Curated annotation (Swiss-Prot):
Organism classification: Eukaryota, Viridiplantae, Streptophyta, Embryophyta, Tracheophyta
Name of the gene encoding the protein in the UniProt record: HSP70-17
Organism: Arabidopsis thaliana (Mouse-ear cress)
Motif (Prevents secretion from ER): 865-867
Protein name: Heat shock 70 kDa protein 17
Biased composition range(s): Basic and acidic residues: 833-867
Signal peptide start and end residues: 1-24
Amino acid sequence: MGKIFSWLVVLLSLISLVPVPSESAVLSVDLGSEWVKVAVVNLKRGQSPISVAINEMSKRKSPALVAFQSGDRLLGEEAAGITARYPNKVYSQLRDMVGKPFKHVKDFIDSVYLPFDIVEDSRGAVGIKIDDGSTVYSVEELLAMILGYASNLAEFHAKIPVKDMVVSVPPYFGQAERRGLIQASQLAGVNVLSLVNEHSGAALQYGIDKDFANGSRHVIFYDMGSSSTYAALVYYSAYSEKEYGKTVSVNQFQVKDVRWDLGLGGQSMEMRLVEHFADEFNKQLGNGVDVRKFPKAMAKLKKQVKRTKEILSANTAAPISVESLHDDRDFRSTITREKFEELCKDLWERSLTPLKDVLKHSGLKIDDISAVELIGGATRVPKLQSTIQEFIGKQQLDKHLDADEAIVLGSALHAANLSDGIKLKRRLGIVDGSPYGFLVELEGPNVKKDESTKQQLVPRMKKLPSKMFRSFVLDKDFDVSLAYESEGILPPGTTSPVFAQYSVSGLADASEKYSSRNLSAPIKANLHFSLSRSGILSLDRGDAVIEITEWVDVPKKNVTIDSNTTTSTGNATDENSQENKEDLQTDAENSTASNTTAEEPAVASLGTEKKLKKRTFRIPLKVVEKTVGPGAPFSKESLAEAKIKLEALDKKDRERRRTAELKNNLESYIYATKEKLETPEFEKISTQEERKAFVEKLDEVQDWLYMDGEDANATEFEKRLDSLKAIGSPISFRSEELTARPVAIEYARKYLTELKEIIKEWETNKTWLPKEKIDEVSKEAEKVKSWLDKNVAEQEKTSLWSKPVFTSTEVYAKVFTLQDKVTKVNKIPKPKPKIEKVTKTENTTKEEEQSKSSDEAAKEEESHDEL
């Protein structure tokens, strides 16, 4: 089975990671509606090969949030910190808005009480107006900020630059959404190696430590996240192949089908609770006031509802408490798990729909399924688990994967495989498919509306990546539309099946040029399409194919052959006619021409004769994308402008972080120094007047810090800190030397004592060492001792608050210099013993004796032969 697939070889075992000479790392990003998780594949020594990166709060997942407050941009945890106070300034669920039309997004944010100020941009997509009232960001720009944030988390984790990533996407993401994420990555300055469907990441993680050589299996991955639910059917198996002369088993999996429910998720359950508690609070408040109309109140309520739902997963009842929910009124209540399940009654049966659909369309029964693996945070709800368990008829659900991290870890393996800097050993074949089928349709002045110009291009679940080719009989310029195959299965918010449009030109010119020639076949347009590993379909190029047949003069051959002059296959030859020569010259730059003639043996020429030759010209056509709508790509100008905006924000963020760091350093220095100045150690090495003046300076800067310096820039903080250090550093240095200097003195004296023994050992056991070298070492040691004795005596006469006569650093420097000289002398090798050379006379005598012995032996042999 494995032979029929195109293979993506993927890491299965962490110990199979093989480093290349240079350090390299890649990351995966699980971009959810509410959370973003980051995993890093890093071959750096001392670090786990694959690990989840923690954020600034040491958490393994970060809020997928962007906020703007007082001119500053906040990301992740920082943005989450102001959600309750400024809900209109914190932008969430951005993944669910990318590539969507304005009306769809407007309806969505209203349904979940998100108080965003949105506008419709020129593409019909959403622009989000931030709190300054004038700046508008596209969803792609805001997603770029989150991807940049994820990249920074990875770099902080890996301690090296990380720009190559794989981003997981839900299977129902259409072309507009996938293109939008790719554009966001371009704006973020990161390189997306591929988008990967979430179920493929989970399936890869599932297959890491399993062997399917003894039996294949079907596994369903059931994922309920915040905003959607899907079920993916995956078939695991193994095949055998030869590797280095041995038969090895290779595991593989193929995604057979995936079905989803776009409006069902953990958020659906939370909104039932929100509505329930909003009604309850309205009754308490009275006067016809509806808390739903107040964004800040709803933000507080939604935040607490999340906690209440989590408590209900482990307890049969849960409290909810919101201080100052609205109009200075606190809200407190409780809810039982039974009541919660009743509020969500219709959701439980609905949760089975993806499971039922995937079984129905695959023709399998639940008994054919080896496991139903649950992933996604919402699958922790007990009622959901019991509903699924009852449907599949098993005593226990399959929970072998980490519900939160399976996708990001599996995607990290995918990223490692795609990276040029990481080599993998163990293999797992992956065949994922397109969740949508696609059509291609041609339009133009002479394009007939029939099956020949509107046809299936990509069937549903076509493997990723793939190349497609279609040929059309046309002689005029035309337009190409790419559309979803079924209007019954469309991405969320899609109003038209058509998602991409192209104009193809150059065909009319080519047709006009060659129409007067003897065409042997109708002019055709060949179109080349690709379905990328990210699941994005595009028209890559087009060619005009023109075939002509012409009579030409060719040399006669003195042979008897079939006089039939019909076309046959052969290699290209030059034409003799002037007309054909001109055509060849004209088309040389823009076309590929091939000639076909009959193959004949080489014989003597008897003049010329007429023969037919077939020539094929392939002329590149101009393909220009003209897609409109929310999924339209940014123009070059828009892309450049967006990059400038984001770079300015990045620069401002760096300056803000630097300012905050320097402000914190200044504040910490003031508090730490004041505390030190009151210690006995500092009293020893400073005068009372010196300490008093320094404390006054510290107080002065501290007052400035909390008043005029509250909004100062980084340069101001750095300048103030340097001015304090100029006073404090000499005092701190004297304090440090008070401890360090005696240690250095003791070290030096101990070494000088040891050196005397070393010199004695040299004189006794290493007699080959030159005496002058030993004397040099002895003299240098004496110099060090004299310098040390003199300065120690001088230091004892000097007050501790004065500048030290000498420092510990100077002591170590002199000892280390002496040690280097000792090492060099100690390494002088012992001379090799002299070997006495054999004199020439002795050699000659030996040779003569050997020669004489040989002659006598030869004579003795001769005498035996005679006998």
